[in-house]
Amino acid sequence: MPKQHVYHLHPLGWENDPEEERFKVTTLDYLTVCSYNNYALFFKLEDSEKERAAEILKAGLERTLAQARHYCGTIEKDPGGGHSFTKKRNSTVRFFVQWLDAPEDADKYPSFEDLEKTNFSAVTLGDLEQWSVPPMTYGEKPEAHPDNSPVVSAFKANFIRGGLVFNIHHHHYTNDVMGWAGFVHQLAENCYAAVNGTKHPTWDPLNLDVSRLIKQEPPEDQKIDGPAPPERHPAHQVGMSLLFHLPKSKAAELKAKATPTDGTWISTYDAFSAFIWRNLTRIRAPVFNPDPKSTLYWCEAIDMRRRMHSPKVPPRIQHNVMFAVTSPTAPVTQPTVAQIMSEWSLSELASYIRRLTNSVTQENLDKTLEMVATIRDKTSLNTRVDAQPPLSILQTDHRDANITSADFGFAKPATYRHLLDRITEGVIIVYPPRDPLPESDEGCEFAIFYEKRLAQDLINDDEWSEYFEYRGVDAEDASEAKKANGTNGTNGVNGSS
């Protein structure tokens, strides 16, 4: 068995904390995915740096947990309805330190070089339970339901030959990706200060002020029943996550191709989103045979931090400060399958994405939350794209996370991944470039959760591969991964190229 130690970390200064603190789960938190997230940061490290890195992370976490205070404790029911992140004076957060770098275990656990060669694939890691804090891996599961007192967070430092895989677990109610990125940058700055003996970063108390996202609820007898909790659509097939790379030069070509001739502005995001939607629909249409006159479900997570204006919010505000705009409910006319595939020009489809994104405002969000406040059981309102039929897409944009610039004092991450052993069909994660230097052509990476038996059709498609480079299998469903023997390029899908 690998050597492992667990620390039960108190937030710095815990001795003087109140006996109990409760941080309300916001009305908006209920609309996110009811699951755990586990993001892994990958560091390149010499053996001589590892012990010190573990101590630095421990000290940095103690200070950061005293700032992002809702990370310490459990989610509990409130007596008057709803839920709260509940921190008691003696609450702790588990920090595991595991050593997977013994020479005799070289055939059991990958090195940093092995991970780098496979673009930091979860398949290369093998059984994610070895690298994680069960049951806090991604996926809708009873342990994550807020009525079951879920633990809010845990951390695990896995030292490997040549590096470190630092796994950060948190309940999705705790943070969206940009809230998590704010937490990571705060942690990195705290670690950097500990290493260099410099002043620690400040923490804006408004980072925990999410009162504007908590709407007044009517009396219990005036509330209404919401929909049944969403379940996975029966038509879905076994999925896997495929990793693709869009070089910056190719993204620029796509934007030029998708820009309307009338001078209407679109973004690079609009261009690649339109291209993705068109081609993923075109390639799979012969299999799923959608009615050309029907419409498809497109959902994108919009970061509201930049869209809040009355008043503005600090960039590191915690919780879920995002809104999932969906094509069926947005005040924009949806395209049909035929229009998505070919009848609309790429410019028209990109312009639709821009109108969809622009339809999300602080005012629209407020109206939605006022409606949500009237629902009796808000836990049934969580977003679940695999409850929609095949060909549905939920795209989440991580481009502003900028994790590779976070200097922990002992190293900067080479990249990060949302580690997965459960595939939610229809999800697309847009990762920021690993190399942010202007002269580099390294662009965004895309983890596309796709039907396994159709994967090779996408990888080999000429129109798709003209822009998107295949980088290998990013993740497989746990039941399938056991058949893969922990190696990439198995199960009939080619490895990275």
Curated annotation (Swiss-Prot):
It comes from the Eukaryota. Gene3D superfamilies: Chloramphenicol acetyltransferase-like domain. Ca(2+) binds at D221, I224, D386, D462. Its EC number is 2.3.1.-. CoA binds at K255, D303, T396. Pathway: Secondary metabolite biosynthesis. Residues 485-497 have a biased composition (Low complexity). Residues 477-497 are annotated as: Disordered. Keywords: Calcium, Metal-binding, Transferase. One of its GO terms (molecular function) is metal ion binding. It is an enzyme of class 2 (transferase). It holds the Pfam family Transferase. Acetyltransferase; part of the gene cluster that mediates the biosynthesis of the tetraketides fugralins such as linear fugralin A and cyclic fugralin B, volatile compounds that play a role in the asexual reproductive cycle but are not involved in pathogenicity. One of the key features of fugralins is the presence of a double methyl group, which is only rarely encountered in fungal secondary metabolites. As the fugralins cluster does not contain an independent methyltransferase, the PKS FGR1 is probably responsible for adding two methyl groups to the same carbon atom. Belongs to the trichothecene 3-O-acetyltransferase family. PANTHER family: FAMILY REGULATORY PROTEIN, PUTATIVE (AFU_ORTHOLOGUE AFUA_3G14730)-RELATED, TRICHOTHECENE 3-O-ACETYLTRANSFERASE. This is Acetyltransferase FGR3.
